Amino acid sequence: LKSTLELSHTVFAVTYTYTGYPMVRQMSKMIEAGALGKIQKVDVQYFQGWINTVIHDEEKKKNTWRLQPEKSGISCCMGDIGTHAFDMLEYVTGLRVEQLLADLNFVYEDNKMDVDGNVLVRCTDGVKGVIRASQIATGEENSLIVKVYGEKAGLKCEQENPNYLYLMEEGKPMGVLKPGHTYNSDLSLDGTKLPPGHPEGIFDAMGNIYKGVARAVKGEPYDKREFPGMSAGVRGMNFIEQVIASHAEGNVCKKLEN
């Protein structure tokens, strides 16, 4: 796909949907501007619970395509939601994961697909972090939480509460940034369709990605953060492959391709 795209000179996008949220974009721009200082720690959690009701029932398990290797490939949890967590880490920080070490959970020995796992990552600039993804986190719905800690401050965003971006500073009350206010970046404001105080959600995030693609197709100026492109897609696939390999080879460190 990558070589075909380079020859065709067309536009390619991956719907890593959560990058379309205005406050996720604001988080990215604040980190780029140095609001946190040097990044010291990154923690991304993506927890769901829906497979917990499936994994213990053989009949349900047989009828769930994500748990069938012939339909979903080499991974369930990491391939389904772990890739979103991985992309969010790179999107908001601007860092690139260079190495990883994965420990996956299959619950039952005869289950061929991962349904839970932890991935230690080493990024550019020597930054270390962790990606935790689970589809057996009982009671969780769609809990994607991204936390980035720097020497000066920390930022946290929660997918289930996308209109809030939390700014954490030592010895100060937690700050809450919201969409639509003039203190936000142009990238964030461009993705905001309603006045402050009017909640926006997942369909708006999708629309922001499509809007960026439309600008690219029409040859209009656009910010590279408006939609994930081929590079993000290829890195996501490499992430899945290396996570599975790391676990299968005894939880060893694996390098990601640049």
Q: How should each PLM-predicted stretch be described?
A:
Residues K2-L7, H198, N208-N258:
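C-terminal helix-rich "cap/oligomerization" subdomain common to oxidoreductases
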